Curated annotation (Swiss-Prot):
Function: Component of the acetyl coenzyme A carboxylase (ACC) complex. First, biotin carboxylase catalyzes the carboxylation of biotin on its carrier protein (BCCP) and then the CO(2) group is transferred by the carboxyltransferase to acetyl-CoA to form malonyl-CoA.
Organism this protein belongs to: Chlamydia abortus (strain DSM 27085 / S26/3)
Main localization of the protein described in the UniProt heading: cytoplasm
One GO cellular component term noted in the UniProt record for this chain: acetyl-CoA carboxylase complex
GO BP of this protein: fatty acid biosynthetic process; malonyl-CoA biosynthetic process
Documented EC number(s): 2.1.3.15
Name the record gives this protein: Acetyl-coenzyme A carboxylase carboxyl transferase subunit alpha
Highest classification ranks of the organism: Bacteria, Pseudomonadati, Chlamydiota, Chlamydiia, Chlamydiales
UniProt xrefs under PANTHER family: ACETYL-COENZYME A CARBOXYLASE CARBOXYL TRANSFERASE SUBUNIT ALPHA, ACETYL-COENZYME A CARBOXYLASE CARBOXYL TRANSFERASE SUBUNIT ALPHA, CHLOROPLASTIC
Subcellular location(s) per record: Cytoplasm
Keywords: ATP-binding, Cytoplasm, Fatty acid biosynthesis, Fatty acid metabolism, Lipid biosynthesis, Lipid metabolism, Nucleotide-binding, Transferase
Amino acid sequence: MELLPHEKQVVEYEKTIAEFKEKNKKNSLLSSSEIQKLERRLDKLKEKIYADLTPWERVQICRHPSRPRSVNYIEGMCEEFVELCGDRTFRDDPAVVGGLAKIQGQRFMLIGQEKGCDTSSRMHRNFGMLCPEGFRKALRLAKMAEKFGLSIVFLVDTPGAFPGLTAEERGQGWAIANNLFQLARLKTPIIVLVIGEGCSGGALGMAIGDVIAMLEHSYYSVISPEGCASILWKDPKKNSEAAAMLKMHGEDLKQFAIVDVVIKEPVGGAHHNPAAVYRDVRDFILREWLRLKDLSIEDLLEQRYQKFRTIGLYETSSESSPEA
């Protein structure tokens, strides 16, 4: 597993404990109580390190090569999954994986953005950067869900929509805008979960829903930290400062009413205990589905409209208001 800079001290401590345990099999260097004491110190060290992570360190966790991706969540949560492909206009976009899913006996239309896990699959998936056909594919499946009375689950994980010339020629901006328009008035419950990177219009094109959740170390932002640093300071190396300024993580976005729920991750990130994350995400989906399914279509659409209508509102106190 690839090591992040802030993980080195933890890994060295873990190796030391493992060496003591191995030597103890031949010579009793430490008692079991002393080993347990070292393990408790390790737990405290982990808690301290991961409680004091900077925004940039959390971005690194979010981008960890071993972090679970959409296909992993599908395998970990679903009893059944039937993939549906193509946009019925141009071609299939491998950066989107979607289809009919069964979770705890309940049927959903599950649509996820997929980056890939190694060099060949990342190239095949275009590193999770959607082309116009990817957005059209997602919308086609969403409308199919509406037609058959299925709730929709979107899994967001993208560094952004594909910025290439071919994507622009095929109407990238229009495809994203049309998704925003169509998803806002879709007559079925929509649950959105940001599981990794949620960057710019590439994320927003699949993030219109009745409830929006994020994993603890995922991020949701108008731009990547590197892109922000390049624009503001002409220096992509100032990504740490940009990550802090963008307020891109769950606790900040929840205060701004951009996201509704932040799902805790295991200590160190989702890649350290994927099974626990699959369970928590599954439970969240089922809990929100139970809440949304009994709403009338009128109430569902009105709440969705008001949710996005109020994003960006702010209040000023009368004391700070200029006198007439």
